[in-house]
Amino acid sequence: MSGGWLGRTAILLFVALVTVAPAGAASPGSELERLPDAEHTFTSPDGRVSVEQYLKKTAEDDHVYQFWTFDEKHQNGALLNPNEDTDRAGYPAGFRFSRNSQWLVRMQKLGAGYHTLFLYRRTGDQFSSATPKPLGDMAWDYFFSQPVSRMMHRKSRDRDSLNHKQVHLVQGMDDNYAGMGKHWPDSRYIVLTLSFDSQGEDKPKPWIDGWRCVFDTKTGQFSIPVDLADHNAKAVEFRDRRRR
């Protein structure tokens, strides 16, 4: 009789423990070193989610960075960039939250003069990838679908050879681009700027410096608003500037 009572108690205790501490709760391993500086930690506007950065040394005496999100109690960790190597995560990153705290952009240096963006969507107190490929790669796909890329005599297959290829976030995501005079729906649009140069080309072709486009988080589509068209025309650079 007493044995049955003890057995039932043990089962109930086990169930309670599983409920309190769910199996599979993620956290950085002991082999990771957290970047302690405040500039490497980012908190959402609603204060419920934070991003921390960790350094992992590899067997080849190299290192890769991992980016983790946590809730306000520093529980329920989630890794933003699983399976990334030094090609995509060889440097610390910058992060920007949308004003409604539902979107997160990772601003990632790839090397000297190379930069891209990643977009994450929030579910509960965790973020996961919002696009099938880096947002920066999608922006280049869009650029190469535009007539301006054909004017430069560059084709889609040439994108990997572009010199100093960069995609950056235009300042204003945190205030919904009010500083640009926009009155867009809250946290729906993200403004990006693209650049590359012709350094090293024997006969330099036109390049772009600060060419802009807008990503719609609701539809997943890119566009160029009318008020950015003039800006983009001036963003095209020629070796002989008189041709502009």
Q: Language-model features: where?
A:
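Extracellular-facing segments of soluble proteins and assemblies that are Gly/Ser/Thr-biased and enriched
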Residues: 93-129
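Short, solvent-exposed loop/turn segments at conserved positions within beta-propeller repeat blades
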Residues: 58-64, 110-115, 204-208
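Bacterial N-terminal signal peptides that target proteins for export
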Residues: 1-11
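Short N-terminal edge-element motif at the start of the domain
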Residues: 37-100
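Acidic, small-residue rich beta-repeat scaffolds with periodic aromatic anchors
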Residues: 25-42, 112, 124-244
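Recurrent small/Gly-Pro-centered beta-turn motifs in extracellular repeat architectures
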Residues: 54, 107-108, 193-194
